[in-house]
């Protein structure tokens, strides 16, 4: 459970945290230069942020370049006949144990997960187990778990847990532009590169020296390989801020299906008009999209939702209202928290 403990940050602390989230590969000197701070100030603040878990460093593997065909979002509405904790104990063993799932969150009457997969067969198996398990527990009423498939070749992921626009708004700092996160550029790895790749994904904070000792190769080789992975975007580092310390209380999940007679122009990226600063995840195909946003309070959520609905209706992009679910971050439980290691090892095996 995410007990919200809001912490007021100083002006310097806001700049450093924003700098870390926006530039997770940057060193203290680079952040200091960007914001006009002393390097020693940045170093001291970063050290405290690490010790007090203000953020978590995550290495996101670009598995679309190594054989993964799709990202899949699955969401479910539950009949809350058993307590959330008991449901999670059951699903952790039977469903969340699947290598494909890297993020999963649940509340009493709903939940969703996000996966990478080599093919649809793997996802189909997970969903069959999910439906069977929930059905036996009498957790499902009329609706089956709903899956939204994003094949990398025909999808665009504009934001993938990108907290930069959100922090820009919260801290009143100028924001940078978005980038498409999962461009497909097929690549091959040597046996040694695969070992280093998996180690970085599993332990993003581990220094090259320790990776080298663990794998039995030289520190120089590890450093060279890691630099290559980061420069050619085989791995993208993300810094995920601590929701609790930012006072974020509401997570909103949107599934929007577009009117097939008048969808937004996919090639011209018209759908980006829906983006606001609170949206941290935004994936789309030609006729549907998934968005996830975070808010401090109900007013912020309501205003952001109203803007999205106004835009959808104004453009006549929808024939019926989207599916929108809100999660209280005081009550919700993150079941799987950005664990990319199992699916990385499975894809690269």
Task: Show the residue positions of the predicted features.
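A compositional/biophysical signature of low hydrophobicity enriched in polar/charged and small residues
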Residues: 1-349
